[in-house]
A protein has these predicted regions:
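Generic structural signal for alpha-helix starts
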Residues: 1-3, 300, 372
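N-terminal zymogen propeptides
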Residues: 2-9, 17, 23, 645, ...
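Hydrophobic membrane-targeting alpha-helices
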Residues: 27-35, 501
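Signal peptide processing junction and immediate N-terminal pro/mature segment
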Residues: 32-44
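Catalytic centers of hydrolytic enzymes
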Residues: 50-95, 101, 131, 135-136, ...
Length: 656
């Protein structure tokens, strides 16, 4: 049976009940990996005689970095502390051609997060530059990572895979590629065994694929590839998807492995978008830890190799499975740093992997080779196209908008952004978004964290007018001013919880100093707070007015804010008690669309927040010490990259 029939036979059946019933837990203890060859014979070319040679090439977490990775990732360290300058798809194409030469059975794949990244052309052009580059690199298939769901599952299937134009609020569509042809989608497919519809329990993508290799006598042997998405994707800030659920990885992998074996597949590879850390040498491994490592020790012994991603780490090692037999456990860094290579030898009669002859290596994607001219042209084309499009005028402005906060915590930029959020929640949903919609659409009010205690504000810069009466606003300026690639989300929140969220603007820091992390409100909201009141007792229910009506604690209000704020990642936990969430468009798509829809940005209303009693404003500290909005990190291409950089500097592993 050929691959299409096998995949169709399994299809997108319900996974919830079946995955839950798969036993997978076995007793294991922490281990340190051995060398990246199962035996001494594994790396000997002569050992391939009589066996079917299979080459598995892989990259991960490219994140749209086509020209080069950010500076912090442009050097990697190998054995003996040697460093290599790496990155760029034009150089990758040259290395891939060298590695593929003479290998009849070669596959090139990735464990996810290839697009929805942070290099400017990919970020602003609906990730089409990345897909064209991957098509020209010859990618065969890929696992869906969390960032593949940064828009919607429908966007991944309809636009990325099928090439159907994406409306993007009128500002994101199918752009001409480097040949001048319109975007036609990926020449490869995406897979995930554990990303399912929350409503139906069916996988939103095929769970596995089966490829075929040539064997002696004109026969063909199958190899199965199982794909896993990181658990929790549906709740991450960028990929917040109320209509999606990610199932237990171990159960899903074991279920697929059993199914593939029952179908007669003798060689199985696991490609998972979840990771681990295992030392600093990109081509070895020591003291591994992390969720992928824990899974690797326990997952089905029928799986012959485990290729990981998500953690932006690099390692190459052999780990024993639950039966004690070694198998490759590898990750190829991020942003085009490395090309991983796993070599399998299949028994020509049975199609099973001869584990003793398995080997793996991570190759640095060095920049000391001639760049491939076709890929170099792809990079040049998209960089120029993005620059020209960014300079295009999408609106005008007659007022300046500042992030500078008043003693009451207001700013003109904050008020503008709150008005945008309310507008965005009242627009038609993404045409590719098929997730269930709540009974009540739109939103009653917007809250925007202009200076949160945790994380970063959605506001990146001031939006200043020049001396002209109607100053032009270019796409690039609007795009950079607001957003970090996350969706706005609306949800039902009780008036009581809304009051609690407003109270949570004030908190005592570790030194006992009262701090104030203000929330901007949309123009239909007015409220006042008592600067002399205690923490937790500064905002009275009657002091909050929405559309001219005093707030009622028992009433449900539909609030729109950023996904980070709603899920408690900005320091307002009361908002986390929400119901019926609905995802709206990504901020970096939606704010430029708002500017274009308005045509002209006029001055926004102020005085939405007032302080009583007024005399207590002297001294100013009576309102609390305002949390200073952080400045974007200089030299980084986007707010998302700035957030990742800040997370790394703070010693936290970012959700990548």
């Amino acid at each position: 049976m050929e691959s299409g029939a096998l995949v169709e036979e399994f299809g997108r059946r319900r996974f919830l009940a079946r995955a839950a019933g798969v036993a997978g837990a076995v007793g294991v203890k922490a281990l340190t990996g051995t060398a990246a060859a199962a035996t001494g014979a594994a790396s000997d070319a002569a050992s391939a005689a009589g066996y079917v040679d299979v080459q598995l090439l892989h990259i991960t977490d490219l994140h749209g970095y086509l020209s080069a990775p950010p500076a912090r990732d442009s050097l990697i360290t190998g054995a003996g502390g040697r460093t290599y300058a790496v990155g760029g798809v034009a150089y990758m194409a040259t290395h891939l051609a060298r590695l593929r030469a003479g290998r009849a059975n070669s596959f090139f794949f990735a464990p996810g997060d290839l697009f929805s990244g942070w290099e400017y052309p990919a970020f602003t052009l609906a990730d089409e530059p990345t897909i064209e580059a991957l098509n020209r690199l010859g990618l065969d298939f890929a696992t869906a990572g969390n960032h593949e769901f940064d828009r919607t599952p429908g966007f991944l299937r309809r636009h990325m895979e099928e090439g159907v134009p994406y409306d993007g609020a009128g500002l994101t569509n199918a752009f001409p590629d480097s040949s001048g042809a319109p975007f036609h989608g990926a020449d490869f497919r995406y897979y995930s065994a554990n990303a399912v519809s929350a409503a139906s329990g069916e996988t939103v993508l095929p769970p596995y694929n089966i490829e075929w290799v040539d064997a002696p006598g004109g026969r063909r042997l199958p190899i199965g590839f199982i794909h896993l998405t990181v658990v929790g994707t549906e709740g991450f800030g960028n990929s917040f998807q109320p209509g999606l659920t990610t199932l237990d990885q171990l159960a899903a992998a074991n279920l697929c492995a059993a199914r593939l074996k029952a179908l007669g597949v003798g060689a199985i590879v696991l490609s998972m978008h979840d990771g681990a850390v295992a030392g600093s040498d990109f081509d070895s491994g020591s003291e591994p830890s992390g969720p992928a490592y824990e899974l690797a020790l326990r997952v089905s012994a029928d799986i012959d190799a485990i290729v990981t991603g998500h953690w932006h780490c690099a390692f190459n090692m052999m780990l024993p499975g639950p039966d004690g037999r070694p198998r490759p456990f590898v990750e190829a860094g991020c942003h085009g740093q490395l090309i991983g290579e796993v070599t399998l030898r299949l028994d020509a009669d049975t199609g099973t992997v001869v584990r003793a002859l398995t080997s793996s290596v991570n190759h640095p994607n060095t920049r000391d080779v001639d760049p491939d001219p076709v890929l170099a042209e792809v990079v040049t084309h998209w960089a120029g196209y993005a620059q020209r499009r960014g300079a295009g005028v999408i609106g005008r402005q007659r007022a300046s908008f500042h992030r500078r906060l008043s003693p009451a915590g207001e700013s003109t930029m904050g008020n503008l952004v709150a008005d945008w959020a309310l507008w965005a929640a009242r627009q038609a949903p993404d045409s590719f978004d098929t997730s269930p919609r709540p009974a009540r659409s739109g939103a009653d009010l917007a809250l925007i964290a202009v200076s949160p205690r945790m994380g970063r504000s959605v506001i990146n810069t001031d939006l200043l007018a020049g001396p002209a009466l109607d100053d032009p606003v270019g796409f690039d300026r609007a795009w950079r001013a607001v957003g970090y690639g996350c969706p706005l989300v609306s949800a039902e929140v009780s008036g009581r919880r809304l009051l609690e969220a407003l109270e949570q603007q004030w908190a005592l820091d570790g030194s006992g100093v009262l701090t104030y992390a203000p929330l901007a409100v949309s123009d239909n909201v007015r409220y006042s707070f008592d600067a002399a009141g205690p923490v937790g007792g500064r905002v009275a229910p009657g002091a909050v007015v929405i559309d001219g009506v005093p707030l009622r604690p028992e009433t449900s209000y539909r609030v729109v804010t950023t996904s980070y704020t709603l899920t408690g990642q900005d320091g307002y936990p009361a908002l986390g008690d929400y119901r019926e969430p609905a995802r709206h468009r990504r901020d970096t798509d939606s704010f430029p669309a708002y500017v274009a829809a308005l045509g002209t940005l006029e001055a926004v209303s102020t005085g939405r927040v007032t302080v009583k009693p007024v005399p207590l404003l002297d001294p100013p500290g009576s309102t609390g010490l305002l949390v200073t909005p952080p400045e974007p990190v200089p030299g980084l291409p986007s707010p998302v990259a700035a957030e990742e950089e800040a997370a790394r500097d703070a010693g936290r592993r970012p959700v990548c």
